Amino acid sequence: MNKNCVEVGKITQARGLKGCVVARIEPILESFDPINYIFIKIGHTLVPYQVEEITGQAQQVFIKFQHISDRDSVRELIGSSIWLSQEILDKLVVQEEPYIDIIGYQVTDKYQGELGIIKDIEQFPLHVCLVVDYLDKELLIPYEPALIQDLDHEQKKIIVELPMGFLEAMGCK
């Protein structure tokens, strides 16, 4: 496997009759230009596929490959992971916000109440997490727009809506 590649998504289904696929993409990509090819993991090998067109936005995109023109040919790719070279990924990654400004903010869950103070920000390859002191444990909360309900810089508070069972899954309850 190529160590200079990063997994960025997964093919979830075929679309239409002309060899197009639907893919879920990590929310790190701002655009898809200029992608001429992607790698698809087949077995233990990354196989390059030439891209004719990528459309869509956010985390769901439609990919049309060159030289594939029927639904049956793409069915075997369903469930396969999508990889990009680090060089291409570096050109496409969304520019990071200055997260350092929110260290010290109080994090409150919409349903669970106060969780704690942000003591650090952890940057992982595909996302950013808030590090919060919660019941003498370190709680990692993904810094995702879908979870953030309100960000009040004046009062230094962040209101989040964590999924049901999140705290239990993190070993905090």
Curated annotation (Swiss-Prot):
GO terms for biological process: ribosomal small subunit biogenesis; rRNA processing. This is Ribosome maturation factor RimM. InterPro entries: PRC_barrel-like_sf, PRC_RimM, RimM, RimM_N, RimM_N_sf, Transl_B-barrel_sf. An accessory protein needed during the final step in the assembly of 30S ribosomal subunit, possibly for assembly of the head region. Essential for efficient processing of 16S rRNA. May be needed both before and after RbfA during the maturation of 16S rRNA. It has affinity for free ribosomal 30S subunits but not for 70S ribosomes. Binds ribosomal protein uS19. The keyword Transport does not apply. The PRC barrel domain binds ribosomal protein uS19. NCBIfam families: 16S_RimM. Keywords: Chaperone, Cytoplasm, Ribosome biogenesis, rRNA processing. Its main location: cytoplasm. It comes from Amoebophilus asiaticus (strain 5a2). Belongs to the RimM family. Pfam families: PRC_RimM, RimM. It is found in: Cytoplasm. Residues 94-166 form the PRC barrel domain. One of its GO terms (cellular component) is cytoplasm. SUPFAM superfamilies: PRC-barrel domain, Translation proteins.
